[in-house]
Curated annotation (Swiss-Prot):
Compositional bias segments (type: Low complexity): 16-27
Protein name in UniProt: MFS-type transporter atr4
Membrane topology: Multi-pass membrane protein
Disordered, as annotated region: 1-102
Upper lineage: Eukaryota, Fungi, Dikarya, Ascomycota, Pezizomycotina
Annotated source species: Stereocaulon alpinum (Alpine snow lichen)
Length: 552
C-alpha cells in the first residue's frame, strides 16, 4: 500500500496560502531563464534551437535579445531559483527535476512532440464544440420523428449539451490537478464516444435530451484542461500563438457543425450526424491513446518520487511540490477551487462574463440564420449552412491578429521589466468594438434585405471580435493563474457555457418583439457597454491579481 502522504503529492503545492497567483513553478522559471541567457549569447545559437527547438521564432538577434532580456529581468525567476537552491540545501530528501534540461520536464520535450500534443488537444477541442451545434439543422426531423410540436424541446436538444459543458469542468479540471491530464482526457474521450452512440440510437426525445447532457459533460474535458496542457508545455513568452490555435476549437467547432449538418441531414437523416461525429472523435481518441503522454509537471514529479521511494526504500523522500496535506484536505481544496475562483476573483468573473456574453451571442445568431437567409433571402437548407462560414472567416482574421501581435507585444514590453500577463489583453482592447459593429451591420442589413453579402460581412466583424476575445481571455487567465490554469479555465468555461445555453432560449421572444434590426441593436449596445472591461484589466489587472491572490 502506498504511503498516504505520497498519494497527496500531485497538488499539495497548489494549496499553500503564501503562493501568489501569478508565480510560475521554480523549475519552469529556472528553465526559461537558462534558455533566455543562452539565446542572447551568440546569434549563431539563435538559428539552432529556442527553448523548445523552434528555430523560426529566434532567427534574428533582435527577437532573441528581447526574449533573453525579458527572462533575465524576471524577479520571480530569480527569487524562485534562490528559493529552490535554499530548499535543496536544507532538505536532501526533496525530489526535483534533474537540472534545467531534464528531458522528463515537458518544457524540455522535443519540438515535434510538443507540437503533436498541442495539435491533438486542439483537435479534440474542435470536435467537442462541433457536437454542440451539429444537430441544429436536424431539429425539425427530430421533432417530426418523435411526434413532438414543442419547439422549446427542440432547442433544448442543442442547448442542454452546453449545460453539460458547464457542469463537467467543475469536476474534470480539479481531478486533472490531482491525477494528471491524460487519465481525464482518455476517460472522457471514451465516454463521449459511448454517449454519441447512444444519441445516434436514442429511442425517445427525452432520452435524447438526457444523453446530450451527459455527452456535453464528457466533451467538456478539452475545454476544461486544454489550456492547462498548453501551460504545461509552453513557457509564458511563447504561449500566445499556441493558445490562439487551441482557441479556434470553441469558435470554429460550433460554426462548422451546421455547415456539415445542413447537407448530411437532407441526404442521410439526423442520426447520421451522430455517426459522423463518432467517426471523427473516435479517430482522434485512438491517436491520443497511442501518442499522448502526461504533461502535468506536478504529477510527473509525484510519480518520480514514488519510484525513488520504492527503489531506495527511503519513504522520507518527497516531491518538491508536496507540502504534506492529507488526501482528504487535498481533495476538498482542489474540488472547490474552480467555484471559488469564479466567485472571489474579479478578473475571472468579469472577463468570463464578458466572454460569455460574446459567446452567447454566437449561439443566439445561430437561431436567426435559418429565418434571415431562409425566409428573407430564400436560401435552401444546404446553402443556409454555408453562411456560417462568414463567422469562420472572421475567426481566421482574428487568429492572425492575435498570432502576429500577442507574443511580440509581450516580449517588447517585458524587455526591460517583468513578464506581465496583462500584456495579453492589448489585442482585445483593440478589437472588442468589432462585436457591436458586426451586430449593427448584420441586424440592419437583414432588416432592409440588402444584398446577402452585407449581413455576412457583419458576421465576419463579429467573428473577429469573438475569436480575439476568447483567445485573449484564455491566454491571460492561463498566464495569470499558471499554477491553477486548469481550474481557472474551467471556471471560465462554466460561465461561458451557461450563457451559451440559456441566452438563445430568449432569442425568439426578443426578435419577435423588437425585430431583427432593433433586436441586434440591443445586443450591440450591451456589448458596447462591456468594451471597457479589457482596458480596465489591462491597466489595473496586476493590482487586482495581487490583492486577491490568497483567496483560493
Amino acid at each position: 500500500m502506498e504511503d498516504p502522504k505520497s498519494l497527496s503529492a500531485p497538488l499539495t503545492a497548489f494549496n499553500a496560502d503564501t503562493t501568489t497567483a501569478d508565480e510560475t513553478p521554480a523549475a519552469q522559471k529556472k528553465y526559461e531563464d537558462d534558455n533566455g541567457q543562452k539565446a542572447g549569447s551568440e546569434s549563431s545559437e539563435n538559428t539552432k534551437n529556442s527553448d523548445h527547438g523552434d528555430a523560426t521564432e529566434v532567427n534574428t538577434p533582435k527577437s532573441a535579445d528581447l526574449e533573453a532580456n525579458a527572462l533575465r529581468n524576471s524577479s520571480v525567476s530569480r527569487s524562485n531559483q534562490e528559493q529552490e537552491k535554499s530548499e535543496e540545501a536544507i532538505d536532501p530528501n526533496i525530489v526535483d527535476w534533474d537540472g534545467p534540461n531534464d528531458p522528463s520536464n515537458p518544457l524540455n520535450w522535443p519540438t515535434w512532440k510538443i507540437k503533436t500534443h498541442i495539435f491533438l488537444v486542439s483537435s479534440i477541442t474542435f470536435i467537442s464544440p462541433l457536437g454542440s451545434s451539429i444537430l441544429a439543422t436536424g431539429i425539425p426531423q427530430i421533432l417530426a420523428e418523435f411526434r413532438s410540436t414543442n419547439a422549446e424541446l427542440g432547442s433544448l436538444v442543442v442547448s442542454v449539451y452546453l449545460l453539460g459543458f458547464a457542469a463537467g469542468p467543475l469536476v474534470i479540471a480539479p481531478l486533472s490537478e490531482l491525477y494528471g491530464r491524460m487519465p481525464l482526457y482518455h476517460i472522457c474521450n471514451i465516454l463521449f464516444a459511448i454517449l454519441t452512440v447512444g444519441c445516434a440510437l436514442g429511442p425517445t426525445l427525452n432520452s435524447e435530451i438526457g444523453l446530450r447532457f451527459l455527452q456535453g459533460c464528457a466533451g467538456s474535458a478539452p475545454l476544461a484542461i486544454g489550456g492547462g496542457t498548453i501551460s504545461d508545455l509552453i513557457p509564458q513568452e511563447r504561449r500566445g500563438k499556441y493558445m490562439g490555435i487551441y482557441a479556434l476549437g470553441p469558435t470554429l467547432g460550433p460554426i462548422f457543425g451546421p455547415v456539415a449538418g445542413g447537407f448530411l441531414t437532407g441526404a442521410k437523416g439526423w442520426r447520421w450526424l451522430m455517426w459522423l461525429l463518432l467517426m471523427i472523435e473516435g479517430s482522434v481518441t485512438l491517436v491520443n491513446f497511442v501518442v499522448m503522454r502526461e504533461t502535468y509537471g506536478v504529477v510527473i514529479m509525484a510519480r518520480k518520487t514514488r519510484a525513488l521511494q520504492k527503489q531506495t526504500g527511503n519513504m522520507s523522500l518527497r516531491s518538491r511540490y508536496d507540502q504534506g496535506l492529507t488526501t482528504r484536505r487535498l481533495w476538498r481544496n482542489t474540488l472547490i477551487r474552480p467555484a471559488k475562483m469564479l466567485v472571489y476573483s474579479p478578473i475571472i468573473f468579469l472577463l468570463s462574463l464578458f466572454m460569455a456574453m460574446v459567446y452567447g451571442y454566437l449561439y443566439l445568431l445561430f437561431t436567426t440564420f435559418p429565418v434571415v437567409f431562409g425566409e428573407y433571402y430564400h436560401f435552401s437548407i444546404g446553402i443556409t449552412g454555408l453562411v456560417y462560414l462568414g463567422l469562420g472567416i472572421g475567426n481566421i482574421i482574428g487568429l492572425v491578429i492575435f498570432g502576429v501581435f500577442s507574443d511580440k507585444i509581450l516580449l517588447a514590453k517585458a524587455a526591460s521589466g517583468e513578464l506581465k500577463p496583462e500584456y495579453r489583453l492589448l489585442p482585445m482592447v483593440w478589437t472588442s468594438f468589432t462585436v457591436p459593429i458586426g451586430l449593427f451591420i448584420y441586424g440592419w442589413s437583414a432588416r432592409y434585405a440588402v444584398h446577402w453579402i452585407v449581413p455576412i460581412i457583419g458576421t465576419v466583424f463579429f467573428g473577429i471580435g469573438l475569436l480575439v476575445t476568447l483567445v485573449c481571455t484564455l491566454t491571460y487567465i492561463v498566464d495569470a493563474f499558471t499554477e491553477y490554469a486548469a481550474s481557472a479555465t474551467a471556471a471560465n468555461a462554466v460561465m461561458r457555457s451557461v450563457v451559451g445555453a440559456t441566452l438563445p432560449l430568449a432569442g425568439p421572444s426578443m426578435y419577435q418583439a423588437l425585430g431583427i434590426g432593433w433586436g441586434n441593436s440591443l445586443l450591440a449596445f450591451i456589448a458596447l457597454a462591456g468594451c471597457p472591461i479589457p482596458w480596465v484589466f489591462y491597466v489595473y489587472g496586476e493590482r487586482i491579481r495581487k490583492s486577491s491572490k490568497a483567496t483560493y
